[in-house]
Every structure is written in C-alpha cells, then in structure tokens.
UniProtKB/Swiss-Prot annotation:
UniProt lineage: Bacteria, Pseudomonadati, Pseudomonadota, Gammaproteobacteria, Enterobacterales
Residues annotated to bind NADP(+): 108-131, 216-239
Family: Belongs to the IMPDH/GMPR family. GuaC type 1 subfamily.
Official protein name in the record: GMP reductase
Organism field: Klebsiella pneumoniae (strain 342)
GO molecular function: GMP reductase activity; metal ion binding
Entries under Pfam families matching the protein: IMPDH
C-alpha cells in the first residue's frame, strides 16, 4: 500500500484566470480543429466535442443533429448491422464524417464491428469502450483492432493515468478516452472506491499522449459549458458529453409521464437498467455501477449545442485565444473554493 500526497483536482476545484485579449467579439473565435491521427493517417476537421456512446445519448438521430454543428457522435454499440446499413444509406457524407462506431471487446463485438465497417467503408472512427481500460485483454484487443483496421482511427478507453495512456497508444490507439467515475449517472467511485479527479487525469494523460503523437478525450465530469472549457484548457483534444446532451428529442430515452409531466429516462451503461435491457439483468458476480434518473424533456438538442459552443467561444475570448487550439496554451488555472453565487439556485 502507498499514498500519493500530491493533490488531484476536478473541474469544480478551479477557475480559468482571465487575460488580456485582442479579440473584439466571440464571433472571432474558431472552434474547429484539424487533426491527423498517429496510426490511421486520417485527417479530420470539425468541432472536437463528442456525444457519448450511451443508449440515451449516442443515437443516429443525435448524430444527424450534431453534425450540423461539426460535432461528433460516438454511436452506441447496440444498433444492429442492418440498422447501421440503413442509417448510412440515408445519411450524407458530412454526417458520416462525424460518426464513430462503438464496440466492446468480446469476439461477438469484434465480428459485428467487422461487418459494419466492411459494409460501410465511409465510417472512419472506431471507439473501443470498456469501463476499465487497465486489463491486459483490453490492450490485446486494441492491438488486434489496429491490425484488422489499419486505416481506421481507433479510440480506446477508459483510463486515467499517463502510463496506461502510453500503453494504449503504443498498442495502436490513435486517441485515448480518459475518465473513471466522473459521469453524472456513474457510481463506480462510490461502489468501488476507484477513480481519479477528472481535471488532473486530463492534464496528466494529455502530457503522456501528446509526447507520443496521440490525442485524448476527456470523458465525463462536465456539468456546464465552463467545464468543457476547463477540459480543453487542461489539454484535452476532444471532450465527450453524456448528461449534458441527455433528455433531448434526439436522445432516444424512454419517455414516462408523472402527474401530467413528461420525463425521459437516462441511465449509466453499467446500471441495472442498462444490463437488464441488454443482457437480461445484473450478473451474480457483479454490482451495478450506474444509476437511472428521470430528466424533464428538454426539446431539440440544437439550443443546448449552441449554449455549449457559445460558452466555449466566450471562454476563449476571456483568455485571448482566437482558436480553440490555443486555449490550453492560454490557460492558467486558479484554485478556488467557490464557483458561483448560488442564492437563487433553489428557485
């Protein structure tokens, strides 16, 4: 047993210090970025925000809606091969440019993903997603995926430390997904005692990945647009959002009605709800590590997307970053004990 004494920080522990700026307007800020990925050699440009690969976020409808903003969607892994084919046939090239195919690490997952990619070569991203990216089996699967799909951009996660980030990149991942336990409907930290404050994880993993020519995704922990700005400021190349995009018309959750008001169910992918839906229940050897919540219906996702992008542009103007790429270079975090005036939060 050992104890690390250095303090680890989450988004709530810091604010971004404002700096002098020559920007006259938020409209002067360029949020699009261009990346050429280490292993695939593919080049992509767009707004580096990703809708999470959750049942009630990463849907085909969400992908079509967010592509109009240049935002990516990691489509959840539970669509069939036939559903994928129908979606691809009816989607424009611009939409497909912003779509990731998600997969687990079982043999069945591999075969299904192989079929989807062979039938739809326009799809360029594969997101290999497990809750715990520290297993040897996971590293081996990433290497197998790289060998099978050499020209696809591969995302692998989740991890929270630099050495594992490096391991995944060296095994064939172009992008590493960072985050254990920060999600709004994730209970891993309280069920297992395992986790890592998200901002520190992002800072440390970004340093490791960038040293090898890879990228990272900050996955989880964002509750408001300011958190998205902090993730980018900490060095994240992409930011993945779940709860902030849940509850919309495009989210795909079950709608329930209580006392005349409609709500949409949103649940973690390791929750009892998810496991009951996809594998018939929680296995005897494990515990659910997610929860289910009811969200008031929020209408189309367009307004939320604009709010997030507007907040991000504003953050850039406060530190004088004319492009999103410059935000991390212009960011100085200050430690704080308060974030906002909460006097009217209960109203």
């Amino acid at each position: 047993m050992r104890i690390e004494e250095d303090l680890k920080l989450g988004f709530k522990d810091v604010l971004i210090r404002p700096k002098r700026s020559t920007l006259k307007s938020r409209s002067d800020v360029e949020l699009e970025r261009e990346f050429t990925f280490k292993h695939s050699g593919q080049t992509w440009s767009g707004v580096p925000i990703i809708a999470a690969n959750m049942d009630t976020v990463g849907t085909f409808s969400m992908a079509k809606a967010l592509a109009t903003f240049g935002i990516l969607t990691a489509v959840h892994k539970h669509y069939t091969v036939e559903e994928w084919q129908a979606f691809v046939q009816g989607a424009s090239a611009d939409v497909l440019k912003h779509v990731m195919v998600s997969t687990g690490t079982s043999d069945a997952d591999f075969e299904k993903t192989q079929q989807i990619l062979s039938q739809n070569p326009q799809l360029k991203f594969v997101c290999i997603d497990v809750a715990n990216g520290y297993s040897e089996h996971f590293v081996q699967f990433v290497a197998k995926a790289r060998e099978a799909w050499p020209q696809k951009t591969i995302i692998a996660g989740n991890v929270v430390t630099g050495e594992m980030c490096e391991e995944l990149i060296l095994s064939g991942a172009d992008i590493v997904k960072v985050g254990i336990g920060p999600g709004s409907v994730c209970t891993t930290r309280v069920k297992t005692g395992v986790g890592y404050p998200q901002l520190s994880a992002v800072i440390e993993c970004a340093d490791a990945a960038h040293g090898l020519g890879g990228q990272i995704i900050s996955d989880g922990g964002c509750t408001m647009p300011g958190d998205v700005a902090k993730a980018f400021g900490g060095g994240a190349d992409f930011v993945m959002l779940g709860g902030m995009l849940a509850g919309h018309e495009e989210s795909g959750g079950t709608i329930v009605e209580e006392n005349g008001e409609k709500f949409m169910l949103f649940y973690g992918m390791s929750s009892e709800s998810a496991m009951t839906r996809h594998v018939g229940g929680v296995a005897k050897y494990r515990a659910a590590e997610g929860k289910t919540v009811k969200l008031p219906l929020r209408g189309p996702v367009d307004n939320t997307a604009r709010d997030i992008l507007g907040g991000l542009r504003s953050a850039c103007t406060y530190v004088g970053a004319s492009r999103l790429k410059e935000l991390t270079k212009r960011t100085t975090f200050i430690r704080v004990q308060e974030q906002e005036n909460r006097i009217f939060n209960s109203l």
